[in-house]
Design a protein with these regions (language model features):
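Aromatic-rich juxtamembrane segments at the membrane interface
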Residues: 2, 165-294, 552, 644-647, ...
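Membrane-interface helix/helix-cap signal primarily in integral membrane proteins
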Residues: 2-4, 61-239, 536-540, 549, ...
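Hydrophobic alpha-helical transmembrane segments in multi-pass membrane proteins
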Residues: 25, 29-32, 39-49, 54-60, ...
């Protein structure tokens, strides 16, 4: 293999880097990546003899054909969808039970589906929780396409499933039969084996020990770990559960030592490690980081070391896992591995380890910012401390306890993990909030990565290092503070939230979204771990825009769809003050929620102005102190840049009449329709008088109340107002300097 590598015309790391640009040019249809690839090709022909460069071009052509073929296959699969499914084979290790909700991945006719089902009884729930063997399920269900991206910078579930080879979701209406079956498929049997291990651990070990055992040994974290998952994430150390080189090395080395003690030769052992690698990969759910680590370990067996090892791993991943670099896990895994490879020869000892941790943290920062928009500075120290604890203590300890459990489960050590979780809770309370950097666009990301690479390369040249440091600071500043004005109506489902920020960084948030509480009573077994709308929509968007502080949070009314996620938002961001109407303070439950935020609350009156965009938002209503109902909604109006905006909260027809009576000459270009398009708002008289050029409606897709109402839609059509709806267009955003340009996610 080493001889084969020597025949490559250019260093292997250069080739892998060149092909990475080509990969993104094809799979992401990125003109920027294509430009980068062409630029590197030109440099190649300048730097190397044409004959050698020509050979590289041939290699690029072969990989380009492979990438195009894979991309075409995925395109065909997304177009040639199944019409119906009556039978699926359950992949046992994908089973997830959350309250009365069941989800798993199932195979049918060569396709994989993401399957959902509402469990009908506690007995049925227990049966699926205990299911470990391969089963075929006969069913009645409905196929649909996965939900795509709904907010700028938001999670794209459809794109994620596509990287897993899944193009449709299946909602089961009725299970007709469940039959245990045999299979010769290696993947299915490994899925069953992994599920058996998970269920064994869950039934023989107490909480929280079992979560750490399934997490560190099998890469499986269940819904009952949700609270701790959030704490580890907020501290920037959730990657401790991402199986990687340390775990792979631990198990591979242990396997080799065991077989060598049994008398096997090195030659036979080399081939057995391939079988072990396949089984271990299956037991960890074919995790991206495990696959990468195993490949590097296997290549090292053949004498491929250092950068050649990493580069060849990348080339193999291009072939065996074409979607690897389209996932956050894949990109981060390779980024960590690359930086480790680059810094591995810089000495030994505690000082070298500390330097390595610093280089890794800084080097990975732009990529972390791109995917998560924030960074926890405490993660430097916490990773340094807890990685030793997890890798050198917990991993071997839990491995031994798991092996012993088949003879006698040792559960007396559960107190160690209870102590650990207590310590994590304490640290999360005293630690500062993560630093919000924002999400860099593709140009900024590439410039940041190149700049950091130059910093590492020129680290001994103080003058150049100073210039580069200033450049990097400027790039991060542009990421956190985009030099533009924006008004964004986010897609928060059947709720409402509008974000305003001007070029100076002044921020106003109108409502926070939420979910109306259900009166339906549920049994204990049906209770599930849930996340709020804000945690899935509003909070990620604001962080992607670099927002760490909201200067003024305006709550227009007390409906849960407008204020339900108040606590989540005030926990995630520093809020300068909360502005409410005087009437809303008569609602005791609402006042209690305001007090729980521990934030300054101020009631506003008609005529009060809130400066932003070089202009101001004026409070037009309510003129009288009401009881906090819909007509007690705060109504905001202002000329923002070149257009007049009117935000009406949940104002109904009576309130609209009063508004027109007080302001008969109101000029409105953009109207935010009241009550999500309910027919009780946006009356004919109101619309005929204002004649807004555009109307914004925040409404949930396929909402139960079927809003916006047809009458409202007809009225808006009658005045030729251009309607933007979040259920159809996703998030809607106005951007600009002196005038607005409108864009939507869809």
């Amino acid at each position: 293999m080493l001889q084969w590598i020597k025949n490559i015309p250019i260093p292997l790391i250069y080739l892998s880097f060149l092909l990475l640009w080509l990969y993104y040019a094809i799979f992401s249809a990125s003109y920027l990546a294509l430009l980068g690839f062409v630029f590197l090709l030109v440099c190649l022909f300048i730097q190397f003899p044409w004959k050698l460069a020509g050979k590289v071009l041939v290699i690029c052509g072969v990989f380009a054909f492979w990438f195009l073929f894979q991309n075409w296959q995925q395109s065909q699969a997304s177009q040639n969808l199944a019409d119906s499914v009556e039978r699926v084979r359950i992949l046992p290790d994908t089973i997830k039970v959350n309250g009365d909700s069941l989800s798993f991945r199932g195979k049918s006719d060569g396709r994989i589906f993401q399957v959902y089902y509402k469990l009908q009884s506690e007995e049925e729930k227990e049966a699926f929780q205990a299911l470990t063997d391969i089963h075929d399920l006969e069913l009645e269900g409905k196929l649909s396409e996965p939900e795509g991206q709904r907010n700028f910078g938001g999670f794209d579930y459809q794109a994620y499933l596509k990287t897993q080879g899944i193009y449709q979701t299946l909602n089961i209406k009725k299970i007709q039969s469940l039959q245990k079956v045999g299979s010769w498929d290696i993947g299915e049997n490994l899925s069953s084996l992994r599920r058996k291990a998970v269920v064994w651990i869950k039934t023989h070990f107490p909480d929280p020990m079992r979560n750490y055992m399934t997490g560190l040994l099998l890469g499986h974290l269940d819904t009952d770990f949700e609270e701790m998952n959030e704490l580890y994430s907020s501290l920037g150390i959730i990657h401790l559960f991402a199986l990687s080189g340390m775990q792979v090395g631990f198990f591979m080395d242990g396997f080799k030592k065991l077989l060598l003690r049994l008398g096997l030769t090195q030659e036979k052992l080399k081939w057995l490690t391939y079988l072990f690698s396949l089984i271990y990969a299956g037991l960890t759910g074919f995790s991206a980081s495990v696959i990468r680590s195993l490949l590097q370990k296997l290549l090292a067996q053949h004498g491929v070391k250092g950068l050649d090892n990493f580069a060849l791993t990348v080339l193999v991943l291009f072939i065996v896992m074409p979607n690897f670099f389209l996932t956050a896990g894949g990109v981060l895994s390779c980024a960590y591995a690359f930086i480790l490879t680059m810094t591995s020869k810089e000495g030994e000892g505690l000082k070298a380890v500390a330097r390595e941790s610093l280089v890794i943290s800084l080097g990975i920062l732009p990529i972390l910012s791109f995917y998560f928009a924030e960074f926890q500075p405490w993660s430097f120290l916490l990773t340094f401390v807890f990685s030793f604890l997890f890798d050198l203590v917990f991993l071997p300890l839990l491995s031994i306890l798991f092996a012993l459990s088949f003879l006698y489960p040792v559960i007396q050590l559960n107190f160690i993990f209870e102590w650990l979780e207590g310590m994590i809770r304490f640290v999360s309370q005293v630690a500062s909030k993560p630093l919000v950097f924002g999400q860099p666009n593709a140009w900024l990301l590439i410039l940041l990565l190149i700049s950091l690479a130059l910093v590492y390369d020129l680290r001994k040249n103080i003058k150049k290092l100073t210039v580069l440091s200033l450049l990097i600071t400027g790039l991060f500043f542009l990421t956190k503070h985009p030099l533009e004005n924006e008004i964004t109506m986010m897609d928060v489902g059947q709720g409402e939230s509008i974000f305003l920020r001007d070029v100076t960084g002044k921020t106003i948030l109108i409502d926070v979204g939420g979910k109306a509480e259900s009166d339906k009573k549920i049994e204990k077994w049906q209770e599930k771990a849930t996340t709020s709308n804000a945690q899935r929509t509003l909070i990620p968007y604001l962080k992607s825009r670099g927002v760490a502080k909201i200067d003024q949070l305006i709550l227009t009314n007390t409906d849960k769809e407008h204020v339900g996620d108040l606590l989540e938002v005030t926990k995630a961001f520093h809020v300068g003050e909360i502005l409410v109407s005087k009437g809303s303070l008569k609602q005791k439950e609402f006042v209690a929620e305001l007090q729980a935020t521990q934030t300054k609350v101020r009631s506003v009156s008609v005529g009060e102005n809130l400066p932003i965009f070089g202009g101001q938002l004026e409070v037009l209503s309510p003129r009288k102190i009401g009881d906090g109902g819909h007509d007690d909604s705060l109504v905001l109006y202002g000329k923002l840049l070149d257009r007049h905006f009117l935000f009406t909260g949940n104002l109904e027809e009576k309130g609209e009449k009063d508004l027109l009576k007080q302001y008969p000459d109101l000029e409105v270009d953009v109207l935010k329709a009241g009550q999500h398009g309910n027919k009780k708002s946006s009356s004919s008289a109101f619309l005929e008088k204002l004649k807004p050029e555009m109307t914004l409606i925040s409404v949930g897709k396929n909402n139960r109340t079927k809003l916006p109402h047809q009458e409202t839609s007809t009225r808006l059509e009658g005045i030729n107002s251009k309607v933007y709806r979040t259920d159809q267009q996703g998030a809607i955003r106005f951007k600009g300097w002196n005038s607005w340009k409108i864009e939507s996610v869809r």
